[in-house]
């Protein structure tokens, strides 16, 4: 039997062999992973840990916060603020950036996260997760500002998520492919379970909230209608629909077996480019998908090339198997 490779060993070997992971970045990723283990424990306790239900507050997007949203946010901040790897953090659950306090050493990295994606699923025991993205701070000596975070997704140096489901699985990229690690609860560490994850170019599964179909743009309606027509329509094959209402869970399925995920613009809020957050959700997930051989777009532009203008910017998201994403891009171009 081959020996188990822990996350720490994997990162050290990547650092040693490929040079993709500087020591400070390796330590930062390990701290994020430890925070995810703590969040996993809180999620697993459920009603026994008094973590279910609403916290009675709203986040910056005006969404009702769950107790676990706040707990996960605090866990990530407390785990990362003192290590000396970070200059600042930004969270979907916080209005402004969180600068590392002066009592702790400051590092060269910026951490962004959605502490608990899919939190509407908490009370019904469906998979949820943590999404994170790491950027490098500019090298000047001035203090950290919000503008330091406003980098295109192609500037990320690490990205990943941790899905809390039947197993707790950490999925990571540092720009050299995608690796998956499963939490060994007896050992207390993440163990490498899959390397060089690859998404098939073609698929027969799509993930979208069909109840919103009447609000979509015509290119998305056209694509979904063709999928629904199945083998009798222009696609010549049947499709299945999947929708978990947790981006982490839907993207994890796509990384495991292919598919296409859509959260498109809709006309109910025409002034907003989309629903999902560019910096906390779309960028890290798009990089993971691309690193696995897939593609990600807002319909008109590669997501990783979008230059953000504000911290909580929203975006339309289409990602997954390459040929399906390219078809959708062509439809948006009028082809």
From Swiss-Prot:
SUPFAM superfamilies per record: Carbohydrate phosphatase
Domain of life: Bacteria
Keyword tags: Carbohydrate metabolism, Cytoplasm, Hydrolase, Magnesium, Metal-binding
Cellular localisation: Cytoplasm
Gene Ontology molecular function, alphabetical: fructose 1,6-bisphosphate 1-phosphatase activity; magnesium ion binding
Main location: cytoplasm
EC number(s) stated in the UniProt entry for this protein: 3.1.3.11
One GO cellular component term: cytosol
UniProt: Mg(2+) 2 binding residues: 114, 117, 281
Binding, substrate: 117-120, 209, 275
GO biological process: fructose 1,6-bisphosphate metabolic process; fructose 6-phosphate metabolic process; fructose metabolic process; gluconeogenesis; sucrose biosynthetic process
Cofactor(s) this protein cannot do without: Mg(2+)
Residues that coordinate or bind Mg(2+) 1: 92, 114, 116
CC cofactor note: Binds 2 magnesium ions per subunit.
Catalysed conversion reaction: beta-D-fructose 1,6-bisphosphate + H2O = beta-D-fructose 6-phosphate + phosphate
SS bond partners: none
Family: Belongs to the FBPase class 1 family.
Name this protein carries in UniProt: Fructose-1,6-bisphosphatase class 1 1
């Amino acid at each position: 039997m081959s020996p188990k490779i822990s996350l720490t060993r994997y990162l050290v070997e990547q650092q040693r062999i490929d040079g993709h992971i500087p020591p400070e970045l390796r330590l930062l990723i390990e701290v994020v992973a430890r925070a995810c283990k703590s969040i996993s424990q809180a999620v697993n306790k459920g009603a026994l840990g008094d973590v279910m239900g609403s916290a009675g507050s709203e986040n910056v997007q005006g969404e009702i916060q769950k107790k676990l949203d706040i707990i996960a946010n605090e866990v990530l901040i407390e785990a990362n603020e003192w290590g000396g790897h970070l200059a600042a953090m930004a969270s979907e659950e916080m209005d402004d950036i969180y600068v590392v306090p002066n009592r702790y050493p400051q590092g060269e990295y910026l951490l962004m996260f959605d502490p608990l994606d899919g939190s509407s699923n908490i009370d019904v025991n469906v998979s949820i997760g943590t999404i994170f993205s790491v950027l490098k701070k500019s090298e000047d000596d001035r203090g950290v500002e919000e503008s330091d975070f406003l980098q295109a997704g192609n500037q990320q140096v690490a990205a990943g998520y941790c899905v809390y489901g039947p197993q707790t699985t950490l999925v990571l990229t540092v720009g050299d492919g995608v690796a998956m690690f499963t939490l060994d609860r007896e050992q207390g560490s993440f163990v490498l379970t899959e390397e060089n994850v690859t998404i098939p170019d073609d698929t027969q599964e799509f993930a979208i909230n069909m109840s919103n179909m009447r609000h979509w743009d015509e290119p998305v309606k056209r694509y979904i209608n063709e999928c629904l027509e199945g083998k009798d329509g222009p696609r010549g094959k049947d499709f299945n629909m999947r929708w978990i209402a947790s981006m982490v869970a839907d993207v994890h399925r796509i990384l495991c077996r292919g598919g296409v995920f859509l959260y498109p613009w809709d006309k109910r809020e025409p002034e907003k480019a989309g629903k999902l957050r560019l910096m906390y959700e779309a960028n890290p997930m798009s990089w993971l998908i691309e690193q696995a051989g897939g593609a990600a777009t807002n319909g008109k532009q590669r997501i990783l090339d979008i230059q953000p203008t504000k911290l909580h910017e929203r975006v339309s998201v289409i990602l997954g198997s390459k040929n399906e994403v390219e078809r959708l891009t062509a439809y948006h171009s009028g082809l």
